[in-house]
Amino acid sequence: MISYLKGSPIEVIKNTNNRVILVLEVNEIGYELQIPSKLGREISQEKLDTIQIFTHVQIKEDQQILYGFSTTAERELFRQLISVSGIGAQSAIALIDTLGLEELVQAIVTGNIRILSQPSGIGRKTAERIALELRTKLSQWRKMVGVTVTSSAAMPSLEILEDIEMTLLALGYTNEEINKAISTLSQDNLMLKNTNTEEWIKEAIAWLSQGT
């Protein structure tokens, strides 16, 4: 089993299936790894001489595929995702790529189906299955690897969350910005007791406006 590869990034390309491929030279051998597009952009921008990529090997009848990730936590999350029935490697990478590590874990732990349904190819039923099968596992795992997630007990109801997200997304805010706003507001015990969705949205916009 290959745990990681350390070497020189030769090129980052998109293949005919629109998948991001990193060619990594290790001891004069070029390895092809499929990686999240975000990692591909980082490698292209940083132009480092040597990088370390954590790997997952998938062996099929006719080929061996290497998947690469920037951290062991990201790789482990990928492995957890592909353990879910109906979730293949491409869907797992799409989830990690679209949502990022912390946001994806938070969406699973809190059962936020709307967020989990955002990546292309992930329908509502699939998102529900991911949350159902991984919620307990990831609640324990994220503590061991140090992934920070706002506790579901210290957040507004799922109905309020979805209304906030729908409204703020329509206003042009990103998922990352929205989650930060909700996380910050959820630290206020008075806000947590507030069931008025409009006030949550108003406070979230006010908080987000401070950073603009």
Swiss-Prot record:
Disulfide bonds: none annotated. GO terms for biological process: DNA recombination; DNA repair. Pfam families: HHH_5, RuvA_C, RuvA_N. SMART domains: HhH1. Keywords: Cytoplasm, DNA damage, DNA recombination, DNA repair, DNA-binding. InterPro entries: DNA_helicase_Holl-junc_RuvA_I (IPR013849), Hlx-hairpin-Hlx_DNA-bd_motif (IPR003583), NA-bd_OB-fold (IPR012340), RuvA (IPR000085), RuvA_2-like (IPR010994), RuvA_C (IPR011114), RuvA_C_sf (IPR036267). It is found in: Cytoplasm. Belongs to the RuvA family. This is Holliday junction branch migration complex subunit RuvA. It comes from Crocosphaera subtropica (strain ATCC 51142 / BH68). The lineage of its organism: Bacteria, Bacillati, Cyanobacteriota, Cyanophyceae, Oscillatoriophycideae. The gene is ruvA.
